[in-house]
UniProtKB/Swiss-Prot annotation:
EC number per UniProt: 4.1.1.20
PANTHER family per record: DIAMINOPIMELATE DECARBOXYLASE (PTHR43727), GROUP IV DECARBOXYLASE (PTHR43727:SF2)
Residues where N6-(pyridoxal phosphate)lysine is found: 52
Root EC class: lyase
Cofactor(s) the record lists: pyridoxal 5'-phosphate
Family membership: Belongs to the Orn/Lys/Arg decarboxylase class-II family. LysA subfamily.
Alphabetized UniProt keyword annotations: Amino-acid biosynthesis, Decarboxylase, Lyase, Lysine biosynthesis, Pyridoxal phosphate
Binding site for pyridoxal 5'-phosphate: 231, 265-268, 362
Species name: Neisseria meningitidis serogroup A / serotype 4A (strain DSM 15465 / Z2491)
Protein name: Diaminopimelate decarboxylase
Reactions the enzyme catalyzes: meso-2,6-diaminopimelate + H(+) = L-lysine + CO2
């Protein structure tokens, strides 16, 4: 049976736009966002989509139409939010290395809040705000030293990580921020990692942060919001992912009677399973020790398998009644690490379409031009309709900034 995205068969999309091709389901995006709104309804959260997961303008625009706020980590991401019609007043500026130019851009745009991550950043935002004659609304990202139990590259809440202000130093950092005339402290933030499959670290982080909220209140620093970041995982293979309803109930119980607005910053859990990467088999190569299915997608299109040894389910779009083989599914890039799946049993042959699932997050957003390969096109499907939301890059576009310098 042929695979479909909503009501559109994948072969139709391949014929119209070629491969490799990122394909997103609009209904899946909507359902994921509304799942957060429903689960946390009692707390009336501001759900801020983490743009780093997938910064396509049409995806940002769709979330904006649903009432989403946005979590950004660069001036470029802010520019994307604004270009797509997102609301700066519902945008949180996170990130460990904000430049003065980025801070100025964000202040002039009117972002809701800066999540500050160090004493030098506090001083820098004060300096820029004073120069502009503005007041910057700020919170501090506090590192609660909680083990997120995830891949070390995407764990962000331990003492050894570069993110946030150490828990033991947080009170003093808040005192320092409170002395700055052009800063208005409105919140506290934590984010302990990505692709979390266990609820307990999220709850533990919330508990530790609320202890700090109370200590700050005792010193007269009363906060308006609690930002718990993102991190909730999705199913790539057979993971047990946290139940949002249970998470919401735990957070509500912990907040209790405190008058705190809740902010959440999901990324992967909004877009990850809404997208897939469509690719075509170039060759099937049989070897003495290993077989290989060579496809036209590669690590420059989807970096996660090579970077994290991440698993993505891969299946034939139009299954055939032929003998399956066990093989590594690999791209044409000149790296041994250019693989999309290892030791997969699949029935396919030259020219067949394969679908790489759960590629909506950290797929296109991490793509590159390695080996001078053009970045893939992207398509958004809505029912039986579909539209191109990113044209396939051309070699002329890829070389434009260099040709001008010859």
């Amino acid at each position: 049976m042929t695979l479909f995205c909503e009501q559109v068969p994948y072969p139709r999309l391949a014929e119209a736009f070629g491969t490799p091709l990122y394909v997103y389901s609009q209904s899946a995006l909507t359902e994921a966002f509304e799942h957060y709104q429903t689960a946390f309804a009692e707390l009336s959260p501001l759900v801020c989509y983490a743009v780093k997961a997938n910064g396509n303008l049409s995806i940002i625009k769709h979330f904006a139409s649903l009432g989403s706020g946005f979590d950004i980590v660069s001036g470029g991401e802010l520019a994307r939010v604004l270009a797509a019609g997102g609301d700066a007043a519902k945008t949180i500026f996170s990130g460990v290395g904000k430049s003065e130019a980025e801070i100025e851009f964000a202040l002039n745009a009117g972002v809701k809040c800066f999540n500050m991550e160090s004493i030098p950043e506090i001083d820098r935002i004060q300096k820029v705000a004073a120069r502009l004659g503005k007041t910057a609304s700020v919170s501090l990202r506090v590192n609660p030293d909680v083990d997120a139990k995830t891949h070390p590259y995407i764990s962000t809440g331990l003492k050894a990580n570069k993110f946030g202000i150490a828990y033991a130093d947080a009170l003093e950092a808040y005192r320092h921020a409170a002395q700055q005339p052009n800063l208005k402290i409105i919140g506290i933030d934590c984010h302990i990692g990505s692709q979390l499959t266990d609820l307990s670290p999220l709850v533990e982080a919330c508990e530790r942060i609320l202890i700090l909220v109370d200590a700050l209140a005792a010193e007269g620093i009363v906060l308006e919001h609690l930002d718990l970041g993102g991190g909730v995982g999705i199913v790539y293979q057979d993971e047990d992912v946290p139940d949002l309803g249970a998470y919401a109930q735990a957070v509500q119980k912990l907040i209790g009677t405190r008058r705190l607005k809740l902010i959440l910053e999901p990324g992967r859990s909004l877009v990850g399973n809404a997208g897939a990467l469509l690719t075509r088999v170039e060759f099937v190569k049989y070897g003495e020790e290993k077989n290989f299915v060579m496809v036209d997608a590669a690590m420059n299109d989807l970096m996660r398998p090579a970077l994290y040894d991440a698993y993505h389910h891969i299946e034939a779009v139009e299954p055939k009644n032929i003998a399956p083989l066990t093989a590594n599914i690999v791209g044409p890039i000149c790296e041994t690490g250019d693989f999309l799946g290892k030791d997969r049993t699949i029935a396919c042959e030259e020219g067949d379409l394969l679908l790489i699932r759960s590629a909506g997050a950290y797929g296109a957003s991490m793509a590159s031009n390695y080996n001078a390969r053009n970045r893939a096109a992207e398509v958004l499907v809505d029912g039986n309709e579909y539209r191109l939301i990113r044209r396939r890059e051309t070699l002329e576009q890829q070389m434009a900034n260099e040709l001008a310098c010859l």
